[in-house]
Amino acid sequence: RNIRCLAIAGFFATGTTWGVTQWANLYMVKQLGVTAIYAGQVMSVFGTAALIAKPTIGILSDILPIKKNHLAALVMFLFAPALIVFASTSNPNMLFITGPILGIGAFMHSALTNALVVQSAAPHLRGTTAGFVNLFNQIGALLAPLLLGNVLVMTGSYQMSLMSIAIAPVIGACALFFIRLK
């Protein structure tokens, strides 16, 4: 059951992470009218925040008296409002605030879910289990940009495209509450 829940969480959260990462530049350039260089700078700050967030949440998960699956769920829940705030940003200067917040939300969960995969798998099946869960992560990463593109075609709005996928990490977070850790 734990592995199925992690696969579901990964499908939704990792799919959203890569869907957003692939579409954020277009949103900034096409919807907000910033230059590609400006959008690239915002995404560099997004990436830097994500880079710092992963080891930070790993350290916090070792220190805080909270189960890793609950902490991962909390982080996934926070990803949704971070995405909505980013997609609602109309002032390009604010992207340097909302971009890193989104970077943290988009990538922080994976450090915890990776640890949960190892913790949930039988020692002799850890590689197989990691491969299985990552298969669903990749399927999510494949389908999320397609979903965003379809919403864009239907609505003509990059903002609506990004907001449409904000529910996905919430679904992933809900799946994590069904994990039973020993």
Which residues are covered by each model-predicted region?
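Extracytoplasmic gate region of multi-pass secondary transporters
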Residues: 2-54
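Helix-to-loop junctions at the C-terminal end of transmembrane segments
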Residues: 54-66, 152-153
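Structural signature of the two symmetry-related core transmembrane helices
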Residues: 69-84
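Multi-pass alpha-helical transporter architecture, strongest
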Residues: 87, 163-182
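Helix-loop junctions at membrane interfaces in 12-TM secondary transporters
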Residues: 87-98
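Intracellular juxtamembrane helix-capping segments at the cytosolic ends
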Residues: 108-121
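A late C-terminal transmembrane helix in Major Facilitator Superfamily
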Residues: 118-157
